[in-house]
């Protein structure tokens, strides 16, 4: 009798978990029981590939991470950075969109999305992202280098305008 109860309880738990996943209530990471620490270890591997110019390998890792933890902003930012390095600006922008959707104060993603927008010919949306960085700056003093980068890019774009 006890074995049957265990099987019924396990079945109900599995059904609950799958239902939660299918309805977006839990992530694949949670469904699989992968810890945040394990995810960050995989992220570090992807980051190392990225640092050494192994962009396709890094892209595979970051794509997997975003599938397993779609609400983790820095995984999306990393995927955006890889796509930006590969000059796939459409995919980079989409990944940065997800990063910003998950963290509306992600100054770094705004800078990189702005760059990608400008590089893909969407200058006005790119400038808007860079201006957003300046709006967020007072609340994020730790983002000084990104604010400086946004200011520099805005000045460069301003200097390209006809007089």
Locations of regions flagged by a protein language model:
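Long, contiguous interaction/recruitment modules in multidomain scaffold/adaptor proteins
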Residues: 1-37
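TPR/TPR-like (Sel1-like) alpha-helical repeat modules
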Residues: 118-141, 148-155
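Alpha-solenoid helical repeat scaffolds
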Residues: 11, 31, 37-47, 138, ...
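Canonical tetratricopeptide repeat
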Residues: 78, 112, 146-149, 153
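Alpha-helical adaptor scaffolds
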Residues: 36-103
